[in-house]
């Protein structure tokens, strides 16, 4: 499943609605938002999240909101009496650290709950089990990291996700956007530090290989080209390549990698059959070994 983010620090506009519709048409099925706000903005935030939830219902999109204990208090919400939360139209909550796990376990019988994947421990799992949490409503979601050099290490992430998957959790992580980046740093919002600067599709493909069940765009938007590339990959497994100075015969075509995969190049199944790029004989030269 792929999703995207819509933040509530600014008013929701017709452009926001149009972007959501374009993403839904491209195959995205979930929206993430954040309810971490100053207390004096609580009324405005409540109005905006209700509006966002209404748009999500119209577009058949799930809506998960990140919230802390401070955010709950500012909005006048309590996990013990979740009627006000459900009234907004939220699909579920992504729970920040510091919120009582017994209350989380109880909430899981009412709505989906995403736990903090990066900090979840075996003791936390034991507490949730002791409080009879509904495991069909529990998932494990990682953070994004706005500041360069602070994102997660790939090896650590792979190990943590393997553990979470073994426990039965669906995991989620963020990939960077390539459109409007979220401020104030505007340095992209990936989960893995190695993905900072990558295209959304490249990061998505990498996360899919690391036990990641849900993948969301962290930044405000992605470009129409990225939307189309992700839609093609999710629908057919096709990877869209953008190249410059390529022969016209190569562009706009569907190509397949050979089953005997080469280490350093892509060898096309169609290469011999089509003979699109005949090459004149040249003196043989040794290829330097690349480790």
Which residue stretches match the model-derived regions?
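Active-site mouth loops of central-metabolism enzymes
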Residues: 1-17, 66-76, 186-197
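Glycine-rich, proline-tolerant flexible connector loops at the mouths of alpha/beta enzymes
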Residues: 29-52
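Catalytic alpha/beta core domains of metabolic enzymes, predominantly
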Residues: 118-245
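Active-site-proximal loop/turn and secondary-structure-junction residues that shape catalytic pockets
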Residues: 8-12, 35-39, 67-71, 97-101, ...
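Short, acidic/polar
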Residues: 11-24, 74-84, 124-128, 199-206
């Amino acid at each position: 499943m792929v999703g995207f983010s819509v933040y509530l620090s600014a008013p929701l506009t017709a452009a926001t609605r149009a972007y959501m519709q374009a993403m839904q048409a491209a195959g995205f099925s979930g929206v993430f938002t954040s309810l971490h706000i100053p207390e004096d903005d609580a009324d405005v935030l409540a109005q905006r999240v209700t509006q966002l939830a209404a748009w999500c219902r119209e577009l058949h999109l799930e809506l998960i909101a990140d919230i802390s204990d401070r955010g709950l208090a500012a909005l006048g919400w309590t996990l013990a009496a979740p009627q006000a939360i459900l009234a907004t139209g939220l699909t579920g909550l992504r729970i920040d650290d510091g919120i009582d796990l017994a209350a989380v376990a109880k909430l899981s019988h009412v709505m989906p709950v995403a736990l903090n994947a990066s900090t979840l421990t075996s003791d936390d799992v034991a507490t949730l089990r002791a409080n009879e949490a509904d495991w069909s409503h529990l998932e494990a979601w990682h953070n994004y990291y706005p500041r360069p050099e602070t994102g997660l290490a790939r090896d650590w992430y792979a190990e943590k996700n393997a553990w979470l998957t073994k426990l039965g959790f669906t995991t989620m992580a963020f990939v960077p956007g390539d459109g409007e980046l979220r401020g104030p740093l505007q340095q992209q919002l990936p989960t893995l530090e190695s993905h900072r600067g990558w295209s959304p599709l490249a990061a998505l493909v990498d996360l899919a290989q690391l036990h990641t069940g849900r993948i969301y765009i962290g930044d405000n938007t992605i470009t129409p080209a990225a939307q189309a590339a992700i839609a093609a990959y999710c629908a057919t497994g096709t990877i869209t390549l953008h190249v410059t100075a390529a022969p016209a015969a190569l562009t706009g075509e569907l190509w397949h990698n050979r089953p005997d995969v080469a280490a350093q190049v892509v060898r096309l199944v169609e290469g011999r059959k089509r003979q699109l790029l005949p090459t004149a004989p040249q003196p043989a030269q040794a290829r330097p070994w690349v480790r």
